[in-house]
């Protein structure tokens, strides 16, 4: 997330989208090789130049986001106004980020609210994963879910969804929305 890289990637996005300004520009992953000050200065320059209206961060832990906000405040730089993290019934590690977003007035977008399809009823104990599913194409992020404990939870979850007369995906999405 160095200055030159952020500027180049932003310019590329503007060109590909055929627009003069991005409404929201998110950094995707923390960069331990670049001081947060440098990243924020680069983002501030993009905002000051009118290329970006607002900035946010994806995949930061609460402590990293808090450090970024404190750095912005101390140096008078643009603040992250948005956070995006994985969040679902099966991945609640972003709770600290959610709490910080609420306290600081930041927006939050959960990604993978259906846990890569695990909360849709797609995956069944003892059955092969469906062709073309995330578990056949890119299993890495969700491999730890392939356990008896997860299947036990999913079976109870699917039973609850059925009792409510909704699909598991609907109940999972409702939970994410109500928990924010």
Language-model region placement:
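Active-site groove signature of glycoside hydrolases
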Residues: 14-35
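Short, acidic/polar
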Residues: 2-17, 41, 65-70
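Beta/alpha (TIM)-barrel catalytic core signal, keyed to glycine-rich beta->alpha loops juxtaposed to Asp/Glu
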Residues: 30, 34-180
């Amino acid at each position: 997330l160095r200055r030159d890289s952020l500027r180049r990637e932003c310019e590329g996005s503007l060109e590909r989208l055929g627009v003069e300004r991005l409404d929201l520009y998110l950094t995707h992953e923390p960069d331990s090789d670049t001081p947060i000050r440098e990243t924020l200065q680069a983002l501030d320059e993009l905002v000051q130049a009118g290329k970006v209206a607002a900035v946010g961060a994806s995949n930061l832990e609460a402590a990293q986001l808090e450090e970024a906000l404190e750095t912005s405040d101390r140096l008078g730089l643009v603040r992250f106004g948005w956070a995006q993290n994985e969040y679902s019934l099966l991945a609640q590690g972003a709770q600290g980020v959610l709490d910080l977003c609420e306290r600081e007035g930041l927006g939050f977008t959960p990604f993978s609210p259906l846990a890569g399809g695990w909360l849709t009823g797609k995956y069944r104990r003892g059955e092969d994963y469906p062709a073309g599913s995330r578990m056949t194409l890119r299993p890495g992020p969700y491999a730890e879910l392939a356990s008896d404990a997860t299947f036990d939870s999913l079976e109870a979850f699917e039973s609850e969804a059925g009792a409510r007369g909704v699909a598991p995906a609907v109940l999972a999405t409702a939970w994410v929305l109500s928990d924010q």
